[in-house]
Swiss-Prot record:
Keyword annotations from UniProtKB, A to Z: Cell cycle, Cell division, Cyclin, Mitosis, Ubl conjugation
Family membership noted in the UniProt record: Belongs to the cyclin family. Cyclin AB subfamily.
The keyword Lyase is assigned to this record: no
Higher taxonomy: Eukaryota, Metazoa, Ecdysozoa, Arthropoda, Hexapoda
Region (Disordered): 1-21
Protein name: G2/mitotic-specific cyclin-A
Gene: CycA
SMART domains in UniProt: CYCLIN (SM00385), Cyclin_C (SM01332)
Consequence of changing residue 235 to A: Abolishes binding to Z600
Subunit structure and binding partners: Component of the Frs-CycA-Cdk1 complex composed of CycA, Cdk1 and Z600. Interacts (via C-terminus) with Z600. Interacts with otu and (via C-terminus) with bam; the interaction stabilizes CycA by negatively regulating its ubiquitination.
Length: 491
């Protein structure tokens, strides 16, 4: 083992006042003792730092000269001069008190020149306008950093809800219509962070346009199952039904389920899989989607447990690497769920209509070969149209046509397919989706009866919708002309 030695001062140049006893070799040289005699024992203890009095703030008695304290007098209290000023000593209890946050009030606020304090904006209630006998929302400030996609509040989201300041009398009036007693439509805050993000008005159409461009990339092949030798559509349906149960067991977001199916189809479009490894591929796909979409995704051990230990952690992690390599790490894509959420926000969609739309859209995940040829935007638009028709509403509106960029005639083929899928859902062996949407959370939309629709029925609906649109177009110019003339003469 290598060793080193400190240079020895053999000539005693550093400390000439200290003598080294005769016969003592390799003795370490101590530091010079300040304030001692000329000769001291070489083995005497080194001086402590108390002899170096560098504190210039110590109160000194008047008329005396402060000198260095003798090292030998070790019983002298260094803080003896502070005894007269006990009022400056902070009590022990005060040291552990928490600090307080400065808050503006009328005593500390400074009003700008020409303005009174009463005209300043209240920082706590800047979005509430108090009137005589009423409280209504004004200019709700939207959160610009959405972090969650579910109704559970995100750890980084700020709760700015002001529903608590609304009087119960205001809520009871116009509950369904959202109209205040004064006749003004209330601007209720969004329900979660995703919808709060989409409420940014100036970006709404740009976001939709970006979704439409992104959905065309990284599409799975519609007929990939024909090249699979060991698996079939029935096996795929059973796997997706199991993924629905897993997502409900761990309360994963619906977007996680859509992404899992999307990754599965893209992987199977390029790789041939044996039936014994199909569940492993689905498990790894959901594991990737959960890590991509969820805030707190389940651990890999949870997925291994759900497979009844059919696979090991190493196998799941290895399959995760294979899937990511085959997909080239291109994981971001808009699904039908994203479009449905966007339409729900822009059109102020009722909850029952939204859940019915989601139920119809999720049923389409079970049939890969039928619906993989359609874009998610088209699938979501057709699901909205069929859900409105089932609930007895008008199938299509000008607002939906403007947002989705699809006319009612463009949805004919997909709507007819979805109508057949919704009708035969009760006869399927895979019932996880029906059990999911039979709950009170989803308004039990799966219990509603399906409707019969043929091509002729759909053509009649399209004709009626187009006739109504023409009538509205004939009436609209007269109203606009009258309004423009009035505005022109006012100026």
């Amino acid at each position: 083992m290598a060793s080193f030695q400190i240079h020895q001062d053999m000539s005693n140049k550093e400390n000439p006042g200290i003598k080294i006893p005769a016969g003592v070799k390799n003795t370490k040289q101590p530091l010079a003792v300040i304030g001692g005699k000329a000769e001291k024992n070489a083995l005497a203890p080194r001086a402590n730092f108390a002899v170096l009095n560098g504190n210039n703030n110590v109160p000194r008695p008047a008329g005396k000269v402060q000198v260095f304290r003798d090292v030998r007098n070790l019983n002298v209290d260094e803080n003896v001069e502070y005894g007269a000023k006990k009022s400056n000593v902070v009590p022990v209890v005060e040291q552990f008190k928490t600090f307080s946050v400065y808050e503006d009030n009328n005593d500390t606020q400074v009003a700008p020149s020409g303005k009174s304090l009463a005209s300043l904006v209240d920082k706590e209630n800047h979005d509430v306008k108090f009137g005589a006998g009423q409280k209504e929302l004004v200019d709700y400030d939207l959160d610009s950093t959405p972090m969650s996609v579910t109704d559970v509040q995100s750890p980084m989201s700020v709760d700015r809800s002001i529903l608590g300041v609304i009087q119960s009398s205001d809520i009871s009036v116009g509950t369904e219509t959202g109209v205040s007693p004064t006749g003004r439509v209330k601007e209720l805050p969004p329900r979660n962070d995703r919808q709060r993000f989409l409420e940014v008005v100036q970006y709404q159409m740009d976001i939709l346009e970006y979704f439409r461009e992104s959905e065309k990339k990284h599409r799975p092949k519609p007929l990939y199952m024909r090249r699979q030798k060991d698996i079939s559509h029935n096996m795929r349906s059973i796997l997706i039904d199991w993924l629905v149960e897993v997502s409900e067991e761990y309360k994963l977001d619906t977007e996680t389920l859509y992404l899992s199916v999307f990754y599965l189809d893209r992987f199977l479009s390029q790789m041939a899989v044996v039936r014994s490894k199909l569940q492993l591929v689905g498990t790894a796909a959901m594991y990737i989607a959960a890590k991509y979409e969820e805030i707190y995704p389940p651990e890999v051990g949870e997925f291994v447990f759900l497979t009844d230990d059919s696979y090991t952690k190493a196998q799941v992690l290895r399959m995760e690497q294979v899937i990511l390599k085959i997909l080239s790490f291109d994981l971001c894509t808009p699904t039908a769920y994203v479009f449905i959420n966007t339409y729900a926000v822009l059109c102020d969609m009722p909850e029952k209509l939204k859940y019915m739309t989601l139920y119809i859209s999720e049923l389409s995940l079970m049939e890969g070969e039928t619906y993989l040829q359609y874009l998610p935007s088209l699938m979501s638009s057709a699901s909205v149209a069929l859900a409105r028709h089932i609930l007895g509403m008008e199938m299509w509106t000008p607002r939906l046509e403007e947002i989705t960029t699809y006319k009612l005639e463009d949805l004919k083929t997909v709507v007819l397919h979805l109508c057949h899928t919704h009708k035969t859902a009760k006869e399927l062996n895979t019932q996880a989706m029906r059990e999911k949407y039979n709950r009170d959370t989803y308004k039990k939309v799966a219990m509603m009866e399906s409707v019969e629709m043929s091509k002729d029925d759909f053509d009649q609906l399209c004709e009626a919708y187009n006739c109504k649109q023409k009538e509205d177009e004939h009436q609209q110019p007269d109203i606009n002309t009258k309004s423009n003339v009035n505005l022109f003469y006012k100026f």
